[in-house]
A protein has these predicted regions:
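C-terminal, non-catalytic extensions of nucleic-acid polymerases
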Residues: 483-735
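Catalytic palm subdomain of template-directed nucleic-acid polymerases
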Residues: 455-486
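Active-site palm subdomain of RNA-directed nucleic acid polymerases
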Residues: 127, 425-452
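Active-site-proximal helix-loop-helix substrate-binding element of RNase H-like nuclease domains
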Residues: 4-18, 37, 47, 56, ...
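Catalytic nucleotidyl-transfer cores of nucleotide-processing enzymes
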Residues: 77-91, 105, 213-407, 528-552, ...
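Glycine- and acidic
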Residues: 8-13, 31-36, 138-144, 175, ...
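Short glycine-rich phosphate-binding loop at a beta-alpha junction
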Residues: 35-43, 448
Length: 735
């Protein structure tokens, strides 16, 4: 004890206790003045562990000291990664798991969410390293044990100081009048914001609708994603619509209280069912459709197509599509028609569009104040946090109201947003092609790709003759100026289009606005949702500075996928950059050959594929019961690791549990009959028994390298196979 006291003196604010009872008692006294308790994975570990120790060492009654008003922590079982876990909710005292906050607000998947990995990524600082088990560290090096625990706490404090996620949650809670814990979701926050706006206007909120027994929630048609013109394209420009879905809601004044009627989707349902019978997916059924079939009939003023309109007063009327067009577009009613066939009124402003408008204006004002702060960093941070809350509110509203659990859920509104958005984006692409190539066509020669709220185009091919003759100047600057003019012309067309397509008054139609986003020297388009461009101008800000050609924007590629090792991600990123710089086939293939040699020289365990081992408990139990159960390959590989740990008597390596991130390695033929084995990403010391396994380097090269190279540049048709180096002599003697 004397040695421990001397060691403790080396550290500030560190208390030494002889008994756990005294330590827990002091902890309970300290937290009395704490508003928020936090930790890293504290929901699943620290909270249940601490409650359990207090119950065991002190008493069950002492757990009340974690709560207010003499209440005990309330037990809660939740499922995570396929396994039930125990936690406790502290009554009156707020607990926020910093790991869950980090996952929620970083919007990116990481190879590891271990505190050590996140500390290194965000702070360039890691946990204290030690050998052996934590129990051995406690017994044999108490000074390092103290340092280890202090560093964990320091990392948490530094992460919050930098990221301010608890502050952000607090700001969201206050602005939307919800509990801090409620901010971990999106639906309840949005719902309460709508309720608050309703009450602010002196109105009442309608009762919650409940689903009838046996009633199933039907999916809504999603955004339109065009099939790209595959391959390399020069001089790419992109135009995108500002906040498409919130703007659509505002433009058509969409709210439960402004719905006048709905065209019964008889034809649409029949067409979707026909597609399903033809083995098409729901998304494929809508692939080339830019509105419900009934909406298209109305816009075509088809006299021979009969439709039924269900009015909100519970009456229905049968008429021709042409008659409804006349009622809405040529009548005196203040009605608008969405691409879903939903009729909205604009006689008064609906709650949800009004709220979106206010949030949008408030965010603009906050951003202005942030810019006006000058060198006042404290004031800048204050306004930055507040504008970020508005951004989160704006981005989450559409998803929340389309969630069946939301009080304001209405499928008619949800599908009106997506289908109307499709029509607007189709018009944008058509108008771009009209300006560039002379004809109004969303699949025209200048259109390279389109996705949800954006269109990618190139005027280079269309204008090549004029460029060669010197009629049209073609430099980086002139292309920026040209593409800005194209975007301006497109933007100026929305007001009249909105009136023509949906009967919106001009004041509402002008809500839809687009701007030129990128100008890129080259782009590689592979398939839907998978493309990359090397841009040198983004919204007027140049990226080709400091000797760089520009910056890459890559979507849906293996460059950032969590199932791709980091060193392979880096290689693929370099490879893509070469392609977008215009390097020829020979140079790119040489780069691949060099990396293959490097890949082959790596240890076998570094060539595996990252995965997440969900439902380990479930599949382990099934295996024990049935002898051999069906399961995903990476789960069996994880199970093989756990078995080998036991077989080799390995007490130091960590087991693979539910939700663990793992690296899956393929194996050659072996006495155990294993085709693969995994190991935990967070395992800092690979055991010797594992290193001696017969790893199948060729098989892993095919999975982790060949397949991903093909995914990236296979569309170019280059001879990548020529870069493969195999030992032909050894192959001859394989049986």
């Amino acid at each position: 004890m004397a040695d421990a006291k001397e060691l403790t003196k080396r550290f500030d604010n560190t208390m030494l206790f002889e008994k756990e009872k005294d330590m827990l008692d002091a902890f309970l006294e300290l937290v009395q003045d704490a508003d928020i308790l936090s930790g890293w994975n504290s929901e699943g570990y620290d909270i249940p562990y601490t409650v359990g120790r207090i119950q065991k060492v002190l008493s069950s009654d002492d757990t009340r000291r974690l709560c207010f008003w003499g209440e005990k922590p309330r037990k809660r079982v939740f499922e995570k990664y396929g396994r039930e876990q125990l936690s406790f909710d502290l009554v009156g005292r707020v607990h926020l798991d910093l790991l869950e906050l980090y996952r929620k607000y970083t919007y990116e998947e990481r190879h590891s969410f271990r505190l050590d990995a996140i500390g290194e990524h965000e702070l360039d600082e890691r946990k204290t390293v030690y050998e052996g088990s934590l129990d051995n560290l406690y017994k044999n090096d108490f000074g390092l044990f103290i340092e280890y625990n202090r560093q964990d706490t320091a990392l948490l404090a530094k992460l919050e100081k930098k990221l301010k996620f608890i502050e952000l949650a607090n700001e969201i809670a206050h602005q939307n009048t919800v509990l801090l814990q409620t901010t971990m979701g999106a639906v309840a926050v949005t719902e309460q914001a709508i309720v608050n706006e309703t009450h602010r206007r002196g109105m009442q909120v309608p009762g919650r609708k409940y689903k009838k027994d046996g009633e199933e929630n039907q999916p809504a048609a999603g955004a339109h994603v065009a099939t790209p013109q595959k391959g390399i394209h020069d001089w790419i420009g992109s135009v995108d619509i500002n906040s498409l879905y919130p703007s659509v809601i505002r433009a058509l004044n969409m709210g439960p209280e402004t719905i006048v009627g709905q065209i019964r989707p008889v034809i649409t349902s029949a067409e979707i069912n026909r597609a399903k019978h033809a083995k098409k997916s729901f998304a494929a059924a809508w692939d080339s459709q830019f509105g419900s079939w009934e909406y298209q009939a109305v816009m075509n003023q088809e006299k021979g197509t009969g439709i039924i309109v269900d009015w909100e007063d519970k009456t229905s009327v049968r008429m021709s599509a042409a008659q409804l067009y006349e009622i809405i577009f040529d009548g005196n009613n203040k009605w608008m028609l969405s691409a879903n066939g939903t009729i909205f009124t604009y006689e008064y402003e609906a709650i949800i569009p009004g709220l979106l408008k206010r949030w949008y204006e408030e965010r603009q004002e906050m951003q202005r104040k942030m810019r006006d702060c000058g060198d006042n960093e404290i004031e800048r941070e204050y306004w930055d946090k507040r504008q970020l809350v508005k951004k989160i509110n704006l981005n989450s509203l559409y998803g929340a109201i389309l969630n069946p659990g939301c009080r304001f859920f209405d499928m008619r509104i949800g599908q009106s947003v997506t289908l109307t958005g499709r029509c607007i984006t189709k018009h944008m692409a058509s108008k771009v092609n009209e300006v560039v190539a002379g004809h109004y066509d969303h699949k025209g020669e200048s259109i390279v790709y389109g996705d949800t709220d954006s269109v990618y185009f190139s005027a280079y091919k269309t204008l090549q003759k004029e460029i060669k003759e010197g009629i049209i100047p073609w430099t980086k600057d002139s292309v920026v100026a040209l593409y800005d003019k194209i975007a301006d012309e497109v933007n100026g067309s929305f007001k009249s289009f909105m009136t023509k397509a949906f009967h919106t008054p001009s004041t509402r139609g002008e809500v839809i606005a687009a701007g030129r986003e990128l100008v890129a020297s080259k782009g590689l388009f592979i398939t839907k949702k998978r493309y990359a461009v090397l841009y040198y101008d983004k919204e007027g800000k140049r990226a080709d500075v400091d000797g760089k050609d520009g910056k890459m924007k890559a979507m849906g590629l293996d460059l950032k996928r969590s199932d791709t090792p980091v060193f392979v991600q880096d290689f693929l990123s370099d490879l893509l950059y070469m392609v977008l710089q215009g390097k020829d086939e020979k140079e790119v293939l040489e780069k691949i050959s060099e990396f293959r040699s490097e890949f082959k020289s790596r240890p076998g365990w570094e060539k595996g594929s990252p995965k997440r081992a969900n439902n380990m408990t479930k599949y382990t139990a099934a295996e024990e019961k049935a002898g051999r159960a069906n399961m995903p390959g990476h789960v069996r590989a994880s199970m093989n690791w756990n078995r080998c740990r036991e077989m080799y008597g390995d007490k130091y390596s960590m087991p693979i549990t539910d939700g663990a991130k793992v690296i899956v390695c393929k194996l050659k033929q072996n006495p155990l009959g294993y085709t693969s084995i995994a190991y935990p990403v967070d395992e800092m010391r690979i055991p010797e028994w594992f290193k001696e396994l017969p790893f199948d380097g060729d098989a892993m090269e095919a999975t982790i390298l060949d397949q991903k190279i093909d995914n990236l540049i296979g569309v170019l048709g280059w001879d990548v196979q020529s870069t493969e180096t195999t030992n032909t002599f050894n192959k001859l003697f394989e049986f």
